[in-house]
């Protein structure tokens, strides 16, 4: 029961932390240069947090306070809002990276993690916009309170023994980069499809929570190339008939393609590299950037 609860708590927090979502809202209506600055900040924060934070010595209360205070002050003078934006992105990136590592290390239940993500994303929908700060805080509070006990549990400590890079001095070069080539090609294909879909389909600015829910799917895999082919059909159908249903179908197939990459990557790299969680987190952040920024 404890594993089930901890898995749900991890999912609840992962669904609440979407790096760049609230920061993009702060930059709406600003110049393209400002939005490019957001992308650069996201990239820098990912590189700075990569490999640095050990889950055993991490305290989420610091990032919880930064995220909460940042979300309470969305309308600030330009200079001050830029500082808040940088702090918010860095904390979101660091928190989500730790969560991704913990999900990989712990003997967690994938359906429980996915359920937590769905619950969190549901309450982040537009119908609850007036309570977004409160909902984010409520989603992050359980992991903030429970985290200390979680990393001292026998399951976490046993899982950690499989991740040699954190237990001795090693480098990211121990990860077999050759196995990532296939995933990278598939990811770039779906990334391109998502970009094309944003250009040609009617995709209004929204939370895209349905898409993010599908991306986090853990129940079944779909061949990436089949998903891309179905997405092309959805784009062409949407151009001819201009029905919003095709946008939903497009998001569903592209999302399933991304989730298939992440599921395969997770099963192939789990127990081999401590950085597998970081790679999954990096892929997710790239998907979020493509969906929320640009076209």
Swiss-Prot record:
Cellular component, GO annotation: membrane
TM annotation in the entry: 4-24, 31-51, 66-86, 103-123, 183-203, 218-238, 243-263, 274-294
Any Pfam family: Herpes_U26
Regions annotated as coiled coil: none
Places the protein is found: Membrane
InterPro entries for the chain: Herpes_U26
Bilayer topology term: Multi-pass membrane protein
Keywords of the record: Membrane, Transmembrane, Transmembrane helix
UniProt-recorded name of the protein: Protein U26
Source organism of this protein record: Human herpesvirus 6A (strain Uganda-1102) (HHV-6 variant A)
Lineage summary: Viruses, Duplodnaviria, Heunggongvirae, Peploviricota, Herviviricetes
